[in-house]
Structures are given as structure tokens and as C-alpha cells.
Amino acid sequence: MVDFPFAYLVGVDGGGTSCRARICDLFGNILGEAKTGSANILLGGEIAMASIQQAIALAAQQAQLTTADYPNMAVGLALAGAEQQQAWHAFMQQPHPYGAITLNTDAYGACLGAWGGKDGAILISGTGSCGILLLDGQQHVVGGREFPISDQGSGAIMGLRLIQQVLLSVDGIVPSTELAQHVLTHFDNDIDAIVSWSKTARPCDYGQFSPAIFTFATQNDSLAVSLLQQTAADIEMWMQALILRGASSICLMGGIGERIQAWLTPPMQQRIAIPQGDAMDGAIVMARGNHNLFVR
């Protein structure tokens, strides 16, 4: 790469559960990859930096590189929590051994990866949900304000609605279904256990029921079908918001996004594009510079 002062590009995709690092040469050839623990900077900037450095060290080992090569690395960080300005600045003030680092959100990295570094839109629907459009140098974000106040169209919200319907079925207000019985069996038919569980349940705890919802929907379980219809409507709401901001096609990503497509209306199905790459690919693009979310 002409006039680029570093020898290696490093892409890091960091979320609440894992941190993945990929080292490439300037031609995009992958030299090493590794995965470590959480790198959500809202859960602790120092913890995130430790996970990142560990992942890069493991990837470097695979690439037969040493710490002496670190100053020749330009690192692109696509991290959960980077949208919070105070957390962004606190993280960027930490010392590091690399030649340069660039920090933006995991959604931004995923969007860059999905569209090969060019303008485009994605809707991530996994445990949570978030839509992002990159257009003419601007970043447009819809949703993504986390569970339970946002994240419509996600596994967590779908799981929350499931639990609510199960409790209504116990009270005889709505019909019970095989899916409702499946959930009750999970809790040993103990309503108090569901209530106690709910006091500390995290988004991923609600999201754990998503596979069962899809499975029972194939058996025409009325509760499962209604939950997927509602989730599909939520996803179409986010897609429409991105379209109004200028998106023409949208990549659906995440565990729910990849499975919900058949439940969308035909006009929205026609808007769906296939991602060209993932968030690590986007982070590699970020490593080349000019992708910081805020100004240092």
C-alpha cells in the first residue's frame, strides 16, 4: 500500500461475550486469527484492552510475529459500547504497544464488512438489535439502545414476550400451546421460579428461547407463529427506518436476522442483500485510518 507507514493491518471485533482478532498483510492476506473474552468497553475499558491485547498476541503467534512487530501494526477496533463518547475517550487514553489504533462501534465494523468498505446498510438482529446506514460519510443509526427499552426484533425481546404469554396462559387468559408447555417444563412448572429468574435475567437469558420458538413455529404452534410474526414486523420497522434515511438494500445479520427472512413480506425480502464479509473484515478496513467515531 503506497505511503502507508505500517506493515500489518489488524482487525478486532469485540462484543459482550467474545473478542476476535485478525492480522493481515497490506494485500489483505490473512496471517493469523484468534478469539478471547469480552471486549465491550462499557463493561470496563481495561478489561476490554486486556482481551484485545491477548487476542492480538495469539493471532501474532499464529502469524509467527513477535512483540517487536507491534509498532508496525495498524489496529482497527470494532467494539461494543464505543458509541458512548465518555467510554470511547477513556478507552483511547489507555497505553498500547501498536503503531496506531482506530475505534468505532461493532455495528460500524459489521456494516463496513458487509459492504466491502463501501456505503450500505445492515440490520443486526441477534440477542439485541441495531440498524446502521453508512452514506456519503455519514453514519445513521436506528435502535440499539439495549434491552428492555429498545432491541425490538431481537431474541431478547422475543423471549420476554414469550415469558409474558406463558404467564397469561397459566392464568387462563390466552390459550396454552406446546411452546408454552415447553417453557413451563424448563422451569419445572414452578411459576415462582420464573418470577425469581426474571429478577436477574439478562438479555441472553431471554434470548435462549429463540431456537425453540423457531422449532415450534415449524409445527404451526400458534404462540410461536405469533411471536415470529411480531418479530418480523419489528424488523421491517427498522428496515423501513433505514430505507427512509436512504438505504436501498439491507444486509440482515445475527442469529435472528438470518432466520427471520422467510417471515418478512415480499417487498422487504426484495430489499435483502447478502453480506460480503463480517465485522473483522470491516475492522481491517478501519485499520487503514479515518474511521474513528469521535475526535481525540
For the regions a protein language model found, what residue spans apply to each?
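Glycine-rich beta-strand-to-loop/alpha-helix junction loops that act as flexible
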Residues: 76-82, 125-127, 247-257
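Conserved phosphate-binding catalytic cores of ATP/NTP-utilizing and phosphoryl-transfer enzymes
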Residues: 1-4, 99-123, 138
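Short beta-strand-loop/turn "lid" adjacent to the catalytic site in phosphate-handling enzymes
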Residues: 40, 56-103, 115, 199
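Active-site glycine-centered loops adjacent to acidic/histidine catalytic or metal-binding residues
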Residues: 13, 106, 126
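Short hydrophobic/aromatic-enriched beta-strand-loop microsegments
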Residues: 101, 124, 141-142, 270-277
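Glycine-rich phosphate-binding loop of actin/hexokinase-like ATP-binding domains
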Residues: 118-169
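Glycine/charged-rich beta-loop-alpha catalytic/anionic-binding loops adjacent to active sites
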Residues: 34, 95-96, 139-146, 264-271
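ATP-binding/phosphotransfer module of carbohydrate and carboxylate kinases, centering on a glycine-rich
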Residues: 1-68, 114-119, 163-296
